[in-house]
Amino acid sequence: MQTIDAGVRQIALLADDSTDWGAQYGNDNTYVRVLKDLTDWIHELQQEKNDDGTAKYEGLKDTILYCPALYSYTGAGDAWYKDIPSNVQIVMTGGRTFGVASKDFADTFTKNTGRAPFMWINWPCSDMNRNTAYQYLVMGGQNNFLKPGATYGTYDGIMLNPMQQSEPSKQGIFMAADYSWNLWQSEKDGQQSWEDSFSYIDHNSPIASKGSRGLRDLAMNMRILNDGGIDGAHKDAEYDAVNKWWINNESVDYTGKLDVKGVLTELKGKLDGGTATAADFSQALTVYTTLQRAAKNYRANPGDKNMFDQIEPWISYWDDLTASAIDYITAAKQALAGDTEAAKATYATAKAAFAKSDTHTIADYYQRNKPARGGLVIVRP
């Protein structure tokens, strides 16, 4: 009641991570009853008037979000959901903790319960960086967390769990809004939304700027999402069980203009096989030079100071990482040309820059300072 008096106009009953009291006492005696009582109470408050006849709690909604203790829903039934008042929206994470908004999940849930789910997607959530030695940004991943094919009525709604950094989380929020409004019917719809997002989150315009293009080029290499293995093994093709992260098309350029993944993967294969040539290194040099320029362009032309301030540790990381990679490549080319002494000196410079890239820290979930990193799948040397 204190929050409503303070101005809150919608309430929720959030039982996630709580005891499943329904299993002990019966759901009709616990959550169904509580939700019916809450609904009746809100309806009573909606009828209250001030002395002048105006509504005492103007704008108070009777729409209640209810998140069950068993919020992931694995298809076990729960037909009792049909007894929940129609004004209550049932929150589901989509089959696992780091779940997915998909028509398949929603159709199964609706068939078994008689209700459409309100999706709570733990994306672009970066909470699990509490288990890593570094801090990362999740600037993509719609291909794994927002599946095309939904129609009107598939979901009651969608909400996201953002990153620890609120401003760059707007990139995921932009895509979720586009997904909900335009109902993506193909993966290309999601790719286009990803491309379109940066000019809007940077300077609220459909026209890209030098700064937003720089942010976009870096974000292409900062897409992973680590779930810490909380849900066990996944069958997802893009889930790396060793690193416990979704790759999320990291370093894949949807426009095809800069083949970061292709160039660097091919170079690594040739290095492992001892067949790399100066031409191979030159292609990689183009990749790292482009990323170095992207960091400089975003630093010099940010459209939103708050956004830049939260991302800055990663921009400094990219400054040093690309300088390191460029020097490593230069040293390799010098060695191939027979200039051993120059190669040694350049290698030492590269090594120092690489070490410096880990000095740009930011507090994690538990307020422990850790280095900001990106390009963890392909780009980081």
Question: What do the predicted segments below correspond to?
Answer:
Residues 1-9:
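Chitinase-like catalytic core of GlcNAc-active glycosidases
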Residues 185-380:
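C-terminal functional modules
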Residues 5, 18-195:
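Catalytic-core regions of glycoside hydrolase
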